[in-house]
Amino acid sequence: MATLHIEHPVTDFGTWQAAFDRFAHVRQESGVCGHRILRPVDDAHYVVIDLDFPTAAQAERFLGFLQTKVWTSADNAPALAGPPQTRILEPVSRG
């Protein structure tokens, strides 16, 4: 299991959510087996997304898709308000 962790500012959460939802089929086809959307309690204009994949290689490929096809297009990422920070994480321990 690997998690693609993404965080970035947004201009409007509703607009961001609608854009995120439009790519549900792409996430499924790319191997995403679960996701979490979080927001800081003190910042309605920031979003954190965790996308779970069976392998780190799948997470890396999907990150490449986001970097080249989504985040570079105002039509595909209409609420993106700053450069996304990303990491691919693997679990070490679980409680």
Where are these regions (language model features)?
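Short hydrophobic/aromatic beta-strand micro-patches
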Residues: 7-9, 50-52
